[in-house]
Amino acid sequence: MRFVNTLPLIFGLTAALGSSMALALPSDREQPIRVQADSAELDDKQGVAVYRGDVVVTQGSTKLTGNTVTLKQDKNGDIEVVTSVGKPAYYEQKPAPDKDVTKAYGLTIQYFVTQNRVVLIDQAKVIQEGNTFEGEKIVYDTQRQIVNAGRATGSQVTSPRPRIDMVIQPKKKAQ
């Protein structure tokens, strides 16, 4: 465990969350990032930061929670993957002032920064403007706003679901 020279990991966290704000409120990027946890282990040599114990990461309208949140950096010191594990882990973001908060749940939530991709694994659920998507695994492309839901092949799941369950609300007609 090392606590020396932790600024690259902290700046990396800022970059990771800041880039996920592309679909969040415009003011979110300018907000400070706050990490609350019972403990933190920062290893600059390996490029890994692990936060444990009721972890809450917030920036503006974006919130990520879990029992454990891990950040991994690439060789250049940029955050590559943010992983939250919980019972369940939780992610929320307000995409626009006139939109409802998008909520996402999963026993594991992975955010692949450079790929603009959020992966929810095991008991995965997304709630967006009254629509719900549930399944073993949900992959959300934050840049293209595409949701893929299905089986979590190659992953052990606690509650196998052979099928996805989606509820899509009818569009409201303009009056």
Swiss-Prot record:
GO terms for molecular function: glycolipid transfer activity; lipopolysaccharide binding. The keyword Signal applies. It holds the Pfam family LptD_N. Coiled coil: none annotated. Keywords: Periplasm, Signal, Transport. Its main location: periplasm. It comes from the Bacteria. GO terms for biological process: Gram-negative-bacterium-type cell outer membrane assembly; lipopolysaccharide transport. Disruption phenotype: Essential, it cannot be deleted. LptH depletion affects cell envelope stability, and almost completely abrogates the ability to cause infection in a G.mellonella model of infection and in a mouse model of pulmonary infection. GO terms for cellular component: cell outer membrane; outer membrane-bounded periplasmic space. Involved in the assembly of lipopolysaccharide (LPS). Required for the translocation of LPS from the inner membrane to the outer membrane. May form a bridge between the inner membrane and the outer membrane, via interactions with LptC and LptD, thereby facilitating LPS transfer across the periplasm. Binds LPS. Important for cell envelope stability and essential for growth, cell viability and ability to cause infection in different animal models. Can complement E.coli lptA-depleted mutants. Can functionally replace E.coli-LptA in the Lpt complex to ensure cell viability, although outer membrane biogenesis and functionality appear to be partially impaired. Was identified as a promising drug target. Adopts the canonical beta-jellyroll structure present in E.coli Lpt proteins. HAMAP family: LPS_assembly_LptA (MF_01914). Belongs to the LptA family. This is Lipopolysaccharide export system protein LptH. The gene is lptH.
